[in-house]
């Protein structure tokens, strides 16, 4: 029997899911680089900086001391306490140890939440552009993603009116990702409070993905909905060490939420992966409790790169950028390029544009289709200024 014949045995939940486009494009770019092609990759969703030395040393020390066995399923107390201190220091949030769970990366923390709260028929409101995994995680939990399209005019932020229109009796979760991957949008306090007023009293949970909270620009700071006392019982805060501390491969994410939700996620995790990596947990303590000046140094470097990309891309005909307030992506509208012919092919959507840039000009980007925004591209500026300048030059040439 062929592979295709056997695929009929796959579950409905798998068949309904899509592969992560960011991982797909990044993998293709790395393959081309391995073949000797001079690809400038702006597709990766991870910092180009190394993990801080003190964090690496903490991991090495954990290995040398034999801290290599199972830990408590929900994380070691030492790390939970460090997370609590971080949330107090950086986010103005107060949590207890039994309101924290440590997971194998932010993805697992988010997936645990959907599995804990959603049943078949429930609806999850997801503003677009969205991180690629949000709708797929909702589907994995047998819920239905309800996509709310935002626009460049609103800075890619959902309005209270849009939220109100999307709510039905089946609404279970509102996903709020601030700073946003892919747009870099950050909801300020007034905007968050306005959204929360719409759902207050409606028994709707808020999944607040705050993974990029320490990478913001121009004095902007994200406001967590968990800071609103009457909403805190309905908010699940998701975060991790991946982005702020360049620890994507260490796989440490966490949730802060009401105890009963944490207990449910703990149960799910105990039957899937068990605890997060013991060595990485020790390293994460060093990251959260160590000298934070390196986080600010790297944030400042990202800001320089953001300013460069915003300035240069906006000089290319057919491309329009908003200024990202956080994260390390720029999400230009390429509406002005669509319908035109480049490289002998009509650019129908962002996938065509991304494929053209990669195959003809060796610049890896991620098509906006993956984020629910077919007229945009996501470009990561987690690369050196020299690499960014080369990428911009190639993009300019591609569309000249």
From Swiss-Prot:
> Which BP terms in the Gene Ontology apply to this protein?
amino acid metabolic process; biosynthetic process
Q: Alphabetically list the UniProt keywords.
A: Aminotransferase, Cytoplasm, Pyridoxal phosphate, Transferase
Asked whether the UniProt record includes Ribonucleoprotein among its keywords, one would answer: no
Where it sits in the cell: the answer is:
Cytoplasm
SUPFAM superfamilies found in the cross-reference section = PLP-dependent transferases
Residues carrying N6-(pyridoxal phosphate)lysine: 243
List its EC numbers. Answer: 2.6.1.1, 2.6.1.78
Binding-site positions, L-aspartate: 45, 131, 181, 378
Pfam families recorded for this chain? Answer: Aminotran_1_2
One molecular function GO term is: pyridoxal phosphate binding
An example of a Gene Ontology cellular component annotation for this protein is:
cytoplasm
Q: Which PROSITE patterns does the annotation name?
A: AA_TRANSFER_CLASS_1 (PS00105)
Catalytic EC class: transferase
Where is this protein primarily located?
A: cytoplasm
Q: Where is this site: Important for prephenate aminotransferase activity?
A: 18
Q: Transferase: is it a keyword of this entry?
A: yes
Catalysis performed (reactions):
L-aspartate + 2-oxoglutarate = oxaloacetate + L-glutamate; L-arogenate + oxaloacetate = prephenate + L-aspartate
Q: Which cofactor does it need?
A: pyridoxal 5'-phosphate
Instruction: Describe the task this protein carries out.
Output: Catalyzes the reversible conversion of aspartate and 2-oxoglutarate to glutamate and oxaloacetate. Can also transaminate prephenate in the presence of aspartate.
**Assembly mode:** Homodimer.
Similarity section: Belongs to the class-I pyridoxal-phosphate-dependent aminotransferase family.
Q: What is this protein called?
A: Aspartate/prephenate aminotransferase
Lineage start: Bacteria, Pseudomonadati, Chlorobiota, Chlorobiia, Chlorobiales
